[in-house]
């Protein structure tokens, strides 16, 4: 089942074009020709014998598919910046059970009806929408003022019906504001005007701010060119994204202007931040322009091109979206599957408060904490932080690793502190709930603590047991859990049976090159290693 993330039409792509409608449809042979010329991976031999478009596109990734003229019109509405469309007002992703609600748009019908993000629409007007797909999404769209009844499965397994009134939702995808010396850019998607909004917002307000908070939570992506333009306001001139095509040829997308600020960016992300959002966030990290806080992002490291009647003779109002490139952020790292790992893992209910605390200033009359993160200085006013956002302050100190560079400022001077000392100075316990009591003597203590702070590895009862052994199969299971990756494919190793409990994890890790066999086509799943060997 393909997993697609978009805002009722907003998807990450390299470019978008205008269209006219037509009843003529794309043939399987024509679609195969498009894919063979552009798709980033080699198509399997079986794809040549596909009997339908659905069968053909089943051999591609989650982001490559055909759009009818009507679906393409809806798609274009989502990537052109400030748009109006009649729908339920929700950002969605397809899952095998139906349609998952990633977020709801302000003033949209979903918000008014009380549809909660994270729930799954399993039926529309009483008809199952499993597996989720474009044909079901179309049922959520309609004329403004009409209603649609959806059956939703909540996180606890219970179900409920909601009647949602479709509304003409006007969505400005980027807003810029300044409060108390802190700039706040709220960006819901990267459309054609987003780069301009960022550039004008930073240029016009930079003299009034100490730091810039860029909120990309729930931002499913958009145009890569918009992400590069927005990032350039903070990074300045340079190659900010690299594309690699089916032939292994690479090309860089360069920003040629000057940076518009020397203030650090604090990027807010969550699991709904994808694609162009990850280009921006990964670029901020790669160029040393700031930090990322929140939770790990979605993990989409491929870019698409759009084919329509303007650039393909086979198409007449309809369109094909094709994954044509793998992309790499400034600094050379990929976000594919893994996502952007935040500098500070902060629970979402504390993320905004934590960002504002990190946007403090070097005070003269009260104690402050200076954090050096990714080459940038961040100041926390301790008395103000403890009074207004004690939970957020504790979340920041919990997210830091023992090697964090911290300075305590007071009475005109500064002195360096350890993380434990900083926690105590702020009124918290020297150790956090994530600290392990049995790793201090391990030569890999720093690596273990860093991964624990990022919520990538977990202990049990405050212990990590670094000398305990794990089988190679168990290592793959831990990696799969950390990366949220599993595979139904088989054939990588002769001793990894398709029905074994570890096969999905081992095959997924082998597919992305994180593990290899021991020779002779074998993996040796029951061979052991220590946990600290696993960390390295």
Regions found by a protein language model. Name each.
Residues 4-5, 409-445, 458-473, 480-505, ...:
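Feature responds to low-complexity, polar/acidic, surface-exposed segments characteristic
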Residues 62-103, 163:
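PDZ/PDZ-like peptide-tail recognition elements
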Residues 177, 182-432:
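C-terminal "post-core" interaction segments
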């Amino acid at each position: 089942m393909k997993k697609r993330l978009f805002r009722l039409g907003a998807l990450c792509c390299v470019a978008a074009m205008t269209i006219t409608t037509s009843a003529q449809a794309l043939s399987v042979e024509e679609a195969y020709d498009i894919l063979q010329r552009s798709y980033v991976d080699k198509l399997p031999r079986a794809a040549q014998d596909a009997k339908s478009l659905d069968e053909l596109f089943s051999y591609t990734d989650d982001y490559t598919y055909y759009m009818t003229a009507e679906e393409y019109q809806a798609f274009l509405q989502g990537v052109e910046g400030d748009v109006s469309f009649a729908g339920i007002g929700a950002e969605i992703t397809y899952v095998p059970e139906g349609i998952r609600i990633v977020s709801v748009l302000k003033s949209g019908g979903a918000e008014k009806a009380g549809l909660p993000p994270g729930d799954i629409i399993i039926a529309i007007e009483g008809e199952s929408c499993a597996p989720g797909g474009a044909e079901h999404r179309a049922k959520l769209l309609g004329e403004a003022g009409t209603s649609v009844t959806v059956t939703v499965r909540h996180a606890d397994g219970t179900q409920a019906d909601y009647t949602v009134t479709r509304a003409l939702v006007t969505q400005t995808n980027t807003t810029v504001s300044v409060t108390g010396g802190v700039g706040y850019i709220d960006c819901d998607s990267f459309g054609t005007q987003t780069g301009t909004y960022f550039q004008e917002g930073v240029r016009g307000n930079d003299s009034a701010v100490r730091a810039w908070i860029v909120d990309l939570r729930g931002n499913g992506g958009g145009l890569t060119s918009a992400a590069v333009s927005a990032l350039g306001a903070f990074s300045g001139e340079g190659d900010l994204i690299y594309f690699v095509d089916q032939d292994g040829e690479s090309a860089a997308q360069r920003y040629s202007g000057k940076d518009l600020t020397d203030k650090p960016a604090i990027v807010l992300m969550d699991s709904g931040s994808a694609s162009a959002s990850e280009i921006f966030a990964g670029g901020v990290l790669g160029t040393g322009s700031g930090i990322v806080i929140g939770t790990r992002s979605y993990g989409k490291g491929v870019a698409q091109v759009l084919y329509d009647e303007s650039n393909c003779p086979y198409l007449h109002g309809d369109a094909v979206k094709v994954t044509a490139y793998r992309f790499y952020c400034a600094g050379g790292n990929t976000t594919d599957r893994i996502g952007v790992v935040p500098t500070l893992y902060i629970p979402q209910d504390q993320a905004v408060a934590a960002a504002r605390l990190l946007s403090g200033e070097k005070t003269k009359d009260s104690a402050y904490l200076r954090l050096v993160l990714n080459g940038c200085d961040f100041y926390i006013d301790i008395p103000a932080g403890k009074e207004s956002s004690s939970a957020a302050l504790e979340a920041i100190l919990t997210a830091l690793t023992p090697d964090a560079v911290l300075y305590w400022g007071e009475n005109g001077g500064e002195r360096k502190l350890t993380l434990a000392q900083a926690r105590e100075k702020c009124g918290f316990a020297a150790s956090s709930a994530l600290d392990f009591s049995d790793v201090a003597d391990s030569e890999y203590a720093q690596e273990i603590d860093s991964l624990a702070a990022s919520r990538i590895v977990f202990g049990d009862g405050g212990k990590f047991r670094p000398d305990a052994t794990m089988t190679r199969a168990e290592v793959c299971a831990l990696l799969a859990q950390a990366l949220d990756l599993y595979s139904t494919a088989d054939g990588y190793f002769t001793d990894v049976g398709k029905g074994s409990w570890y096969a999905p994890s081992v095959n997924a890790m082998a597919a992305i090159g994180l593990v290899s066999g021991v020779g002779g086509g074998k993996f040796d799943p029951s061979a052991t290693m220590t946990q600290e060997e696993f960390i390295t």
